[in-house]
Amino acid sequence: MPRPIEALIHAEALTHNLARARAAVPDARVWAVVKAHAYGHGIARVFEALRAADGFALLDLAEAQQLRDLGWRGPILLLEGVFEPRDLELCSRLNLWHTVHCEAQIDWLAMHKTHQPHRVFLKMNSGMNRLGFRPAAFRAAWTRLHALPQVDEISLMSHFSDADGGRGIAAAMQVFDDATRDLPGERSLCNSAATLRHGADAAVRADWVRAGIMLYGSAPDFPSHDIAHWDLQPTMTLRARLIGTQDLQAGDTVGYGSRFTAEAPMRIGVVACGYADGYPRHAPSGTPVLVDGVRTRLVGRVSMDMVTVDLGGLPQAARGSEVTLWGRASSGAVLPIDEVAHAAGTVGYEPMCALAARVPVRLDAAG
């Protein structure tokens, strides 16, 4: 038999989370962000569940081609734009909208020969200091683009650095508003955190929001708020089985480095999942896990192919018992990926995207 581990992608949860994005910004359009292999879920698996979105946003031309091959004829936005001049040919052929964040991309457009003008999203660096034109240079970039026959419509966009935290978005909004006040074009500002926390403000939600991590059942501002607060549902479950048990005496240690020591007699279970499956290697003892739908904890260091869990209070647990590393147990109990990631010192995005190729993935169309 195959190794007892699998990941499930819950289609109904994806559809529910997209509906939550729409509810937060009822008069704006929603990009479903499917970059990074749809946050580890797989574009082909999430497409049908998310096709009610107004458009799909991603980074990779191959992923854009995949969406067209799946039958999507609506807008596709390249969030980082093109990486070399010849990419513009594929943008023309696939009818892709693309971000412009630097002078080189404008130069390439000026040299591009096309009969189909491009729809571009001009990006401002409003304080994130990754991609985008600084406010003082933004208007000149817009003027250059506006003069090009290769460019049709110019939308204006930025990305908040602190929409999920206490610093908030007021300063970035002021920078953006000051630099774009009399420029025409649609606006796109909100990521998931801004959509949920600030979407009630018409100026913030603007014309397009970019819903990413919220679609996949992770709270963008965890631990300030969890998925229950935002009415989001887990879309990925990582599930394995117990493949063995051990009875420990007080003083016995567990795993590499003897990081866990039993303080009293206890029983532990060995789970067919490790960091080679995408489980966070730095998850410490105490990280939550579900065994037969009951919450318990990790004990000892995460190994390549195994983790060990506390079976105290679980007398029925035995070889073959279901272990939910994150997501939804067969019993209906839920362990949000955010809790696991937080215990491991990271965020929910990372274990989603780190799901290993060796883990079989199954689409749960009914869940």
Swiss-Prot record:
Q: Which residues take part in binding substrate?
A: 130, 304
Q: Which gene encodes it?
A: alr
Sites where N6-(pyridoxal phosphate)lysine occurs are at: 35
Q: Which InterPro entries match?
A: Ala_racemase (IPR000821), Ala_racemase/Decarboxylase_C (IPR009006), Ala_racemase_C (IPR011079), Ala_racemase_N (IPR001608), PLP-binding_barrel (IPR029066)
Q: In which pathway does it act?
A: Amino-acid biosynthesis; D-alanine biosynthesis; D-alanine from L-alanine: step 1/1
Q: Can you name a GO cellular component term?
A: cytosol
By sequence similarity, the record places it as follows: Belongs to the alanine racemase family.
| Reaction equation(s) it catalyzes | L-alanine = D-alanine
| Reported function | Catalyzes the interconversion of L-alanine and D-alanine. May also act on other amino acids.
The protein's name: Alanine racemase
Give the taxonomic lineage as stored in the record: Bacteria, Pseudomonadati, Pseudomonadota, Betaproteobacteria, Burkholderiales
Give one GO term, molecular function aspect: pyridoxal phosphate binding
Q: Which GO terms describe its biological process?
A: D-alanine biosynthetic process
Q: SMART domains in the record, alphabetically? A: Ala_racemase_C
Q: Where is the active site?
A: 35, 256
Superkingdom, taxonomy of origin? Bacteria
Pfam families from the xrefs? Ala_racemase_C, Ala_racemase_N
**EC number(s) in its UniProt entry?**
5.1.1.1
Q: Check the record and name the PANTHER family matching this protein.
A: ALANINE RACEMASE, ALANINE RACEMASE, CATABOLIC-RELATED
**The keyword Flavoprotein is annotated on this UniProt entry:** no
- Specify the species: Methylibium petroleiphilum (strain ATCC BAA-1232 / LMG 22953 / PM1)
